[in-house]
């Protein structure tokens, strides 16, 4: 039960027949009001209103109180039916419900009023078949039939066999319109036939508790011969079901009420549901067909005198009681238990919550689903356009038939598949242009695709050269019919030569009026000092002379003159064009040229770009500029995108236009398009056809790719779902091959199963992909399975055998699993670790929205490299990771995409305040029998002991574990969210060694670690790393700070059941492993598997190579060091002593209390005022589903205001915040976003929890301000 509403009235009520019904309530007669008031009211309640369910939508005072109310179904002239009231003074009044609701005037709504009854009217009901016919019953045994269309004189149904003093209930038969029943205080129930106008049957019952005094009667919802009665005798509180074909005795007797039953209601939609209420203050739900009680609803404080289902919403019912309440609730109980509602641990709070919490809950003895929740049909649609039909013959045998269902539009998808299969795209394009293209944009797209398919990219910009006139060549002359060149071979010049300058006559070096600068210039020229001469020309602003001199000069001189020319003519459009041509770089042309001349810019891109990738990039950039221009033409941008191969961008543009395309399809009123789903399928088909045609024209192969591929992939996946649902599996599968595996895996598996083809589980596909990526690394999972399941053969090459480990507590196991993740292969290709290197990630893996995003502004963390154990290793750097298709760099609680602007600039996460930490990488044993592994070399000093040829381990183990010196404390400014840590590191005790009865016998001569907690590394402990000038020195790093962020998804491993879902933070008090020769350098062995089973593989990041050191799960925190001094000995439980907890440091006290705004400086006050105004403007518009986001945003903004009030924000940030506030008030959201990003990048040490709130305010304001 879920309580929907509670009306504080002592009223009788009636439901309207709407799906979301109204409730009419009238003050009930015979009850004393809590205020001892004698007034009476008639009210209408909209209990399903989302805004106002606590107040009536209509209320009016009436002269007398009601015994009953009835609300008819709509009929002729009454669009919302009639509301009838039975008054205690014998009056029956009728109101037009439609007029009453619209005018809120009781007098205007009244259509008839009658005093035909001589006493109180106790009951009335409208006929369920003839909605305008009403029956009323009351004192003196009077029963009248009313015709509410004409309001003619009401008539009695006939003469009663045994007259009764009072009629308490009347009820119409639900199947036969002229049959009704009445009951009263005479102890019997009468059945009346209006055709014969007489009482035809007489029902009574006497049981062990005495004679039943019938108080209520109700007919079966669908069977005309069955009805039910209730007795209000406290000694005989029974509910009796009757079949009139045997009226001598009741069919079922329902016992459960402890006192008399006052009301019944038989559900019209489900005959197996019956409500009852009575003098014992209870309301029961029954199955009257089986005669069993289903459940009991919370009791009231006084008699529950009326209960009724809502006619059109039977899962809702109302109960009225004399304790002054009408409770509306659901028949199903979905409310939480009382223990979850009252969960306070404080005694005072517990009693306070208990007193205000609804503690009563329904109790159901039998669980039964109502009919409206059951499947009403024996026909069902199946995946792949299948129709399953179940038929039952006369003998009761069922047959199942599976047919093919041909949906609308399936012919088009079949034709599309044929065209794709036969590469018949020219026919597809022609059909699109000849058919109905719906709108001009779609037609233009197909025309461009046609030109592109026929003449290539060059034809798209041919109009840019229409004004050029080519010079007439000799070949042209010959074609035009002029004389041949050879006819005049000996008669004259074969071609016109250019005139060459030949100096003539005498001249003076210096004229009479020559100035000194000119003389100096001439002297420099005569001395062949070209560079100085050019500089002198430029000083004298003789640019032409400088250009001529530079022709014979060096490249530097030419560049000098060019720069002078371009600076002098920087405002000249020809100069800008010459600059782009001179530099052979069209970046300036693409970025700043007016987009009105986009075709000329495109020609320039074609002329000066050197490779296809640069050409595509510039064309795509030009398309972006055209699309963003105020008067930008969409079709011009489409041409640039198509020419530049920007399928992801052009597809996004097409996807944005899909809703309009669907609306236009629906407006055509075609026979093929009759519903929005038909329009959606055709729009998606048209989109897919354009994508497929473009890929064919440009000879694109492989999967979809690009930075904006996600919307394209989702649209293709939607199309695949639709056509696969129609049974076009081949077409769906063809497009699934083009999708990245991140999108197509599950759907591909589903289609392959539907077509009964062999299917490889998605998990196996991913695992094989990971195996390819991590090929050089050892598979510790295989190692463990091999060593534990099969003994090593005698002729096998010597390999290292890790000791088998006894079961460990969950925390220890997890620490060991983390270390095993980071163990490189001794004999594989060692990959060098660089400062700031990050683990490889799978580009298709789902991003964890709760993990902190990688920050490109964070200083790179230098990573310590372990010392070489034995032999020589060659370093092969890992390939660069492929860019992920999903750039999910938002915070965990950012707004959904609904509030995000479509053209918002990409945002980067702020730099983290935690300093990088140098992390030693542990060493692992090679995989047993791993392919591609060379045989192990003989054991050398400082290496892990190897297994002999007989397969038994040697007795000695040694390793060198080298750690960098301890970090020194340095002074560094931290963010306000930084957690202070102590630099004290107490010693950690050595854990007790454990053994495993399944491990081979091993003895150990392990030396004890030295007393010193730290040791200097050897000079040759690691290869020399390239120094990063921006990374902090290894010797100047703070102790690691514990960050309690959830680990990223690509670091989460497939842990066993006992492994927590997060990695434990490093113990800041633990002593690093010793550098002496001991067992400390040996990587912890895997947990021992159960007998007879192979050990599970170690957890590893999805899509990352095992030879790469895995970053710790916590941001900036290295994994815990391996256990010190582990050895194999007699069985013992592993004990881990916890270091003493240090006292937490007291937080820094703020200058002013939280919430104080009186100390905000003048220069910061506009920030507070503007942001507050915007916040208050959008708060009322925030949808209810995003209310938590709005509350969180306001709390974070208050943190910013507190910082402003305490003057804790630098002037640089304040200036940028002023720009954000100004941009928000002027609704320049793009600029506000850009400035907010600038704050994150330039002042990362100052942004704290408030920055996310500011970002959300900008996003919400863009949607609602």
From Swiss-Prot:
Region feature Disordered, mapped onto this chain: 457-485, 765-784, 793-1163
Protein name per UniProt: Protein transport protein SEC31
UniProt keyword Repeat present: yes
Pfam family, one: WD40
Bias (Basic and acidic residues): 457-480
Alphabetical list of Gene3D superfamilies matching this protein: 1.25.40.1030, Functional domain of the splicing factor Prp18, YVTN repeat-like/Quinoprotein amine dehydrogenase
Spans through the membrane: none
Organism: Candida albicans (strain SC5314 / ATCC MYA-2876) (Yeast)
Claim: Zinc is one of the keywords in the record: no
This protein's UniProt keywords: Cytoplasmic vesicle, Endoplasmic reticulum, ER-Golgi transport, Membrane, Protein transport, Repeat, Transport, WD repeat
Any GO molecular function: structural molecule activity
Pro residues: bias regions: 794-810, 1062-1071, 1083-1101
Membrane-topology annotation of the record: Peripheral membrane protein
Localization annotation: Cytoplasmic vesicle, COPII-coated vesicle membrane; Endoplasmic reticulum membrane
Family, per entry: Belongs to the WD repeat SEC31 family.
Polar residues bias locations: 1004-1023
Superkingdom of source: Eukaryota
Gene Ontology CC annotation, any one: endoplasmic reticulum exit site
Lineage of origin: Eukaryota, Fungi, Dikarya, Ascomycota, Saccharomycotina
Function as written in the Swiss-Prot or TrEMBL entry: Component of the coat protein complex II (COPII) which promotes the formation of transport vesicles from the endoplasmic reticulum (ER). The coat has two main functions, the physical deformation of the endoplasmic reticulum membrane into vesicles and the selection of cargo molecules.
